[in-house]
């Protein structure tokens, strides 16, 4: 379990994902500049968010000014309430989270959802394990939204937020940090969630290709380790080779 931030570029850090499969604990990006802190995703629970906050304290970073949601999936947003900061997201993400926020979250509700939709059992069990205590839980709905693109300016850093959609989540955004040569791509090139996935679904090669840019050296997705541009490009090439080999 990660407990410390990893610096990936000047002023850019990562609270790394936990690779234990049933934890479903994704990466949380951290940008620190001019006395302000911006997070890329909120973590999968208030408990996860509290660990991120402790890691921020360890580098003497201020509490977050904003939290950017890369998409509306639970593991990226359920920590939002813990930071006391407004969230930024795509407008469709806001609509989705408004609906999710209206649900009666509890262990009983999770059990009822499993009965209604058995295909989602593993996801719902992971959700239950992550949150543990539902009594004071709430979903932080984004206050600031974009339709296609917006910029957030810190002291010396530009956050270029762009809606890219994709099969994994239609509300996915990527966050480019040109001065640091880092791009947060989150889950946008992943296949659909497990309960919606077909046998032929794989990584979105066209999405990967569209994000390749000589201006960026580090690519950070939602659940893996940071990759170089060449390593990120190789994901699409490997997918093509596997598809050709299966024909």
Regions found by a protein language model. Name each.
Residues 16-21, 99, 104-106, 191-200:
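Acidic/histidine-rich helix-loop elements
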Residues 7, 37-38, 44-46, 98-235:
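Metallo-beta-lactamase
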Residues 13-15, 68, 88, 144, ...:
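Hydrophobic/aromatic beta-strand patches that form the interior of the parallel beta-sheet core
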């Amino acid at each position: 379990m990660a407990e410390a931030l990893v610096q990936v570029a000047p002023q850019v850090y990562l609270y790394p994902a936990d690779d234990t499969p049933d934890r479903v604990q994704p990466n949380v990006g951290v940008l620190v500049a001019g006395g302000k802190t911006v997070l890329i995703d909120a973590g999968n629970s208030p408990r996860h968010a509290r660990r991120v906050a402790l890691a921020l304290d360890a580098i003497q970073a201020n509490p977050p000014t904003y939290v950017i949601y890369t998409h509306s999936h639970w593991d990226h947003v359920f920590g939002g309430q813990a930071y006391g900061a407004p969230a930024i997201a795509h407008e469709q993400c806001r609509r989705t989270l408004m609906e999710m926020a209206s649900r009666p979250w509890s262990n009983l509700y999770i059990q009822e959802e499993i009965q209604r939709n058995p295909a989602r059992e593993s996801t719902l069990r992971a959700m239950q394990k992550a949150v543990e205590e539902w009594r004071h839980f709430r979903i932080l709905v984004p206050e600031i939204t974009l339709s296609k693109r917006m910029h957030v300016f810190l002291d010396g850093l530009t956050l270029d937020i762009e809606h890219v959609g994709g099969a994994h989540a239609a509300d996915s955004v990527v966050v480019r940090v040109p001065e640091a040569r880092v791009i947060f791509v989150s889950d946008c090139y992943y296949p659909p969630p497990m309960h919606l996935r077909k046998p032929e679904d794989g990584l979105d090669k066209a999405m990967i290709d569209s994000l390749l840019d000589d201006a960026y050296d580090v690519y950070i997705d939602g659940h893996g380790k940071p990759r170089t541009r060449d390593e990120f490009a190789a994901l699409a090439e490997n997918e093509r080779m596997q598809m050709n080999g299966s024909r």
